[in-house]
């Protein structure tokens, strides 16, 4: 039987298709790609597989204290192959979408995707960290809230990430620090939060990947805050002369019924406001194949 959460997810995501429409941007195109399917960012057939004869790193399950929730929270730390504490590594923080958890990226094979990208393009090895984005000090579940309340609980991860998780990771693992060594990426609602966190904290994050991101970070022209009790707009976060991300990558599936338009609108908004970014559309719906494609291409161009 399909759970009520699946029906809820479909319903609220359908709202995004009609609610997130940026005004005054007709005719805008992405800086790098048109709003058509491209093969430029295609991946090898085995890009998300555990390849035969290839050694992969380990995944640590850790627990850290969160002042935001007043409790211990779990996270997964994905270590690169041959992790050596005498060396230091850049870090990528990974954010899941609605109904996900700290172990979601382990389930969808992020360890293999990242190592394969590093091997295929001779990139620097990275540490990745995934955590539960839903942050509720009251100990509630996602199903307890309507969508506006739910997104506010996702927004609350900001304080958890900045004040608790990142300090814990830097203390317990051999990491490189600074924006030039710290990235953030996510899919769906996690993509929305990744965009916000990167633009809100340019001193912390230098790279952002948004894979089929939910809308709500740019001005819809309605004068209202779109999602979440706090609300935020890129127009308030990006100021003339302030640092932009070193790399911003946005991808969506050509048949995504929920977030294709919001991804295009993000790209159009960034183009019209002079924010450098990579945007492309690939074959697929709102699904893992699109998100993992985004992660693979993100890993191969950062650091």
Where are these regions (language model features)?
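Gram-positive cell-envelope targeting signals
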Residues: 1-37
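Non-catalytic cap/lid and distal C-terminal segments of serine-dependent acyl enzymes
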Residues: 29-303
């Amino acid at each position: 039987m399909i759970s009520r959460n699946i029906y809820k997810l479909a319903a609220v995501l359908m709202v995004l298709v009609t609610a997130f429409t940026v005004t005054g941007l007709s005719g805008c195109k992405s800086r790098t790609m048109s709003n058509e399917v491209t093969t430029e960012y295609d991946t090898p057939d085995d890009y998300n597989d555990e390849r035969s004869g290839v050694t992969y790193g380990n995944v640590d399950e850790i627990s850290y204290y969160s002042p935001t929730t007043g409790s211990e929270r779990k996270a997964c730390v994905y270590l690169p192959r041959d992790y050596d504490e005498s060396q230091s590594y850049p870090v990528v923080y990974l954010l899941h979408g609605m109904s996900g958890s700290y172990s979601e990226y382990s389930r969808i094979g992020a360890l293999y995707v990242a190592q394969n990208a590093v091997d295929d393009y001779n990139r620097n090895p990275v540490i990745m960290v995934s955590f539960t984005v839903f942050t509720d000090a009251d100990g509630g579940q996602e199903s307890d809230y309507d969508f506006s309340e739910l997104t506010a609980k996702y927004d609350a991860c900001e304080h958890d990430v900045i004040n608790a998780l990142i300090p814990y990771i830097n203390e317990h693992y051999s990491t490189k620090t600074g924006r030039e060594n710290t990235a953030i990426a996510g899919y769906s609602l996690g993509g929305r939060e990744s965009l916000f966190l990167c633009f809100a904290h340019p001193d912390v994050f230098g790279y952002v990947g948004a894979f089929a991101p939910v809308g709500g970070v740019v001005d819809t022209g309605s004068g209202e805050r779109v999602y979440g009790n706090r609300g935020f707009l890129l127009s308030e976060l990006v100021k003339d002369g302030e640092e932009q991300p070193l790399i911003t990558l946005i991808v969506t599936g050509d048949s995504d019924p929920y977030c294709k338009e919001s991804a295009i609108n993000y790209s159009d908004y960034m183009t019209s406001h002079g924010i450098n970014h990579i945007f492309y559309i690939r074959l697929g719906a709102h699904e893992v194949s699109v998100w993992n494609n985004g992660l693979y291409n993100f890993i191969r161009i950062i650091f």
